[in-house]
Amino acid sequence: MEEVAPEQVQEVQGNTEAHIDSTTASTAPTEALPSDKQSRKANEIDSMADGAPAEKKQKTDQRQIIREPKLDDNGNPIPREPRLPKRKVAVMIGYCGTGYHGMQYNPPNPTIEAALFKAFVDAGAISKANSNDLKKNNFMRAARTDKGVHAGGNLISLKMIIEDPEIMDKINANLPEGIRIWDIERVNKAFDCRKMCSSRWYEYLLPTYSLIGPKPGTILNNDIESSKTELPGVLDEDLESKEFWENFEAAAKKEFTPEEIAAIKDYSPPPREEFDDQEELYQKVKQWKLLENTHRRQYRISEMKLNKFRAAMNQYLGAHNFHNFTLGKEFKDPSAIRFMKEIKVSDPFVIGDAKAEWVSIKIHGQSFMLHQIRKMISMATLIARCGTPVERISQAFGPQKINIPKAPALGLLLEAPVFESYNKRLEKFGYKPIDFSKYQEKVDAFKMKHIYDKIYAEEVSDNVFNAFFSYIDSFNKVTGAQTEESAESNKPATKSIFEFLSAHGIPGIDYGKNEKEDSNKESSNDQVNKESAPATSKPAEAVEQTEKN
């Protein structure tokens, strides 16, 4: 503001007062101004003397705030850095989620975003002045992943300093090997990666021995077998699983005496304070489990069972009410409706030193709810291993509430977010489209080294999938999980909480006639309709595409 000399102020004030006096003298007498008007007039006069309106002067005074310097961890002032321009960018990333409490920033827990943000600051992509607040940098993620979940491709958007042509290499140098930056692309200021993401691809890796039927003597196995007697013809006869367990029993008889086998089956762990890992019987139990795990990893899935699993997964295609596949959603909640665009189940492949067989399931959907994919995988796997009609999945989209357990997080990874519709707008404004396929070779190598190998190794060491399905098989809705022997002894008073997998079906649904006969009739009618449909029929093309996937 231009300074005014004291004599100039006096001159202005004098002229103003003279002007007011002359104006008052030349007019007829009037009522005195109210006090608030007088004070406002006086303020205007003062402001004229200062050379600025009163309101502007007040705002100017308010802006004169003394800012305290930012301090480092030791309490020393952080020197100001030169201000460099920040640009709105999309950062393509991949990471192994092992050891992290999910993607989202959540101090003091280690998260992917915390590691990324630190690397951005250390590399100079974010100034130290803005290093304590993600919001200052307009930080946003395309997809949030939970604890332990991996991503071959994910995307974050934020404002960054990208003048340095080597900024991406510098960021990667400050990141652990399990987190990588694939690329940094300029985007327009309005870009919001979460809202602009049109769909997402997820992958789930599943060992095929997860599809072996429940172990004989468990609660779930007993429920399934008894329901077959009560309602014959509803469930498939799983001769493949029956043969597997018979072969294991034969192998066990070669390694253990009848007395040892009986003692092992009767074994229940003592209280923690009395536990002795050197006890002879406990060592025998460990040998039994080792033999069972070795036998399980030698399992190779049949084409019939794999096709059953594929048919179960295809039940999810299209728009459905997934209220049973998440937490805290009611049937009438419109947000429970989700659309699955494409599902692929790979051919089996053998990998790792253990030579176990796996399949890859890829799911392309517009959006997903909490635990939805893990519950989808779990339901389809339970359907295939129990011989249950695949139509139970479509029935689970109805209003009846059922308990679907969530499969282990170990096999889940985010393949990539998709920005199909927004890419057209980006190109229109002169920006490059967001396309993860450009980095596919690097992403695949990273996934094999830092994600797939860790999944395989963790399953071999911890038997995550076997532990999960063993827990499901022996779960009792009255007393919780129990051993096969205690389940057998309490058989009349126990029933699996997963009764919907048995021939009885989902409670509350009137199946009328034999469910399998009805589904066979529907399949026959569908086949007739397909054969009679014109060659250009779109539904027929859609079915063909689904079968290929």
UniProtKB/Swiss-Prot annotation:
Cofactor binding: number and manner: Binds 1 zinc ion per subunit.
Protein's GO biological process: mRNA processing; mRNA pseudouridine synthesis; snRNA pseudouridine synthesis; tRNA pseudouridine synthesis
Cellular localisation: Nucleus
Cellular component annotations (GO), alphabetically ordered: nucleus
Record keywords, A-Z: Isomerase, Metal-binding, mRNA processing, Nucleus, tRNA processing, Zinc
Keyword Acetylation applies: no
Top-level taxon of the source organism: Eukaryota
Compositionally biased spans, kind Basic and acidic residues: 53-73, 512-524
Catalyzed chemical reaction(s): a uridine in tRNA = a pseudouridine in tRNA; uridine in snRNA = pseudouridine in snRNA; a uridine in mRNA = a pseudouridine in mRNA
Catalytic class of the enzyme: isomerase
Cofactor needs: Zn(2+)
Assigned EC number: 5.4.99.-
Coiled coil: none
Active-site residues per Swiss-Prot or TrEMBL entry: 146
NCBIfam families from the UniProt entry: hisT_truA
Record's protein name: tRNA pseudouridine synthase 1
Gene behind this protein: PUS1
